[in-house]
Amino acid sequence: MSYPEIYPPDQPGFHPIATARTMFVDEIDRAGIETMLERLEASTAMMRAVQIRVLGGAMARVPDDATAFAHRDRKFMVNVAALYERPEEAEVYAPWVADLAAKLQRGPVGAYVGFLGDEGEERVRDAYPKTTWDRLAEIKARYDPSNLFRLNQNVPPTGT
């Protein structure tokens, strides 16, 4: 299937919905690959994916506390996703994503904040080690103490 066939241009009213789960893993073994392939083939989602991004190299040489992005020592970032057309299909595809992600999780829990959906504060916390979270909360308290800019993957200011 070519890319234009995935999202045909000028298709009025077409607004796909996505559900996804992001994580970091330290190992992808044969059983994990077979699980991915079996689940992808079995899914009826209009588009489904397991995206694997190999990490390491220069980014792994940056200390965790040098920036807000952490988990630099992890081997892979994985994103499991399903796209569908009708809101009621979430009942089918959200559990599919969650189950497949749980089967692939290897190592400590983590998340890439740029791929998080509306998953709650616990998942936002998964994106940052405690020291990074605390540092971001202190910065937020200094520059946005009323938490005006909160309609995002929010780190609340210290003291709230």
Language model features: what each stretch is:
Residues 1-160:
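Soluble FAD-dependent oxygen oxidases
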